[in-house]
Amino acid sequence: MSGRVGDLSPKQKEALAKFRENVQDVLPALPNPDDYFLLRWLRARNFNLQKSEAMLRKHVEFRKQKDIDNIMSWQPPEVVQQYLSGGMCGYDLEGSPIWYDIIGPLDAKGLLLSASKQDLFKTKMRDCELLLQECVRQTEKMGKKIEATTLIYDCEGLGLKHLWKPAVEAYGEFLCMFEENYPETLKRLFIVKAPKLFPVAYNLVKPFLSEDTRKKIQVLGANWKEVLLKYISPDQLPVEYGGTMTDPDGNPKCKSKINYGGDIPKKYYVRDQVKQQYEHSVQISRGSSHQVEYEILFPGCVLRWQFMSDGSDIGFGIFLKTKVGERQRAGEMREVLPSQRYNAHLVPEDGSLTCSDPGIYVLRFDNTYSFIHAKKVSFTVEVLLPDKALEEKMQQLGAVTPK
């Protein structure tokens, strides 16, 4: 049995009655605590009464702390309204609202430098509540229960800039919040126009997703427009995504409903860096350099780094060893990222690199040009691996876009 209204086993019916009894003290604090609502929490915890109750009580506290009942009257800051991409547009064939997330033009670093993380989270909570309210309206309009949404992730333009560690960590926090407070509200999630980098990005956020959510993700291949039309009527799908819907002015992207983001002008910045913890610290003598080695076993892995120097600038470059098992000078190795000097004492430096060849990669901090000062450098380096199963599936589908 699915554990949904009208499809409950005797055991599940008994669990529902017991659950309602156990949590009756908090039900008045919830917007619409019908059987559909309570079953969402039970399904999310496999009908384990103790875990379901703990989850729901935690959610009630979350609603109080975040003042969720009044969140729709709150307006996000201007920069978030203008540049946080995404939006609700149309309904699928069953009447569920559709939400689009537009990844490519999203300036994640710009948002975190221009707005507080709290305001960004609050905006996403507001979006979740907006979708739930739309489900209620659709339920009344269609005369049947609508309680979940369809998501479309447009991944065209997903690049290394989106792997910036603070941005990935912030997105992970949001996913945890979503899983804990909006269970069973996702019907399906379509990934369209996924580039080669997508399996690496997915592997970073996968730990934050429940097994149930992972099962609802469908990565579509080159025929993604045809697939979407199996679930969505053409008049409910923007022309941009293979349908016939346009804005009143004829815009095929339906920009009145979907925000396409963009690079954030620096005039909006309220800080020049996001605080980070570094895993390593090293003192580099004057006229010297420091090398750290990372073995890359197969193509498609990503090296991601952050570093800061103390008091003065530092040189940084990446090389690929031509001889394994011995230290090589910079001139003896293959240059992958040209060495240059960075003012990492003023603003921490970060970056990432897709490794096209296997081998030993050397990240070299260069202080050879300094005849007087030693430099203290703090840094974190990680090797990001692709989700191999997803990578293989994308290759079979022909899902990969060139970039």
From Swiss-Prot:
Transmembrane segments: none annotated. One of its GO terms (cellular component) is nucleus. It is found in: Cytoplasm; Nucleus. The modification N6-succinyllysine is found at residues 11, 51, 253, 257, 393. Residues 275-383 form the GOLD domain. SUPFAM superfamilies: CRAL/TRIO domain, CRAL/TRIO N-terminal domain, Supernatant protein factor (SPF), C-terminal domain. InterPro entries: CRAL-TRIO_dom, CRAL-TRIO_dom_sf, CRAL/TRIO_N_dom, CRAL/TRIO_N_dom_sf, GOLD_dom, GOLD_dom_sf, SEC14/CRAL-TRIO_domain. One of its GO terms (molecular function) is lipid binding. Carrier protein. Binds to some hydrophobic molecules and promotes their transfer between the different cellular sites. Binds with high affinity to alpha-tocopherol. Also binds with a weaker affinity to other tocopherols and to tocotrienols. May have a transcriptional activatory activity via its association with alpha-tocopherol. Probably recognizes and binds some squalene structure, suggesting that it may regulate cholesterol biosynthesis by increasing the transfer of squalene to a metabolic active pool in the cell. Monomer. This is SEC14-like protein 2. It comes from Bos taurus.
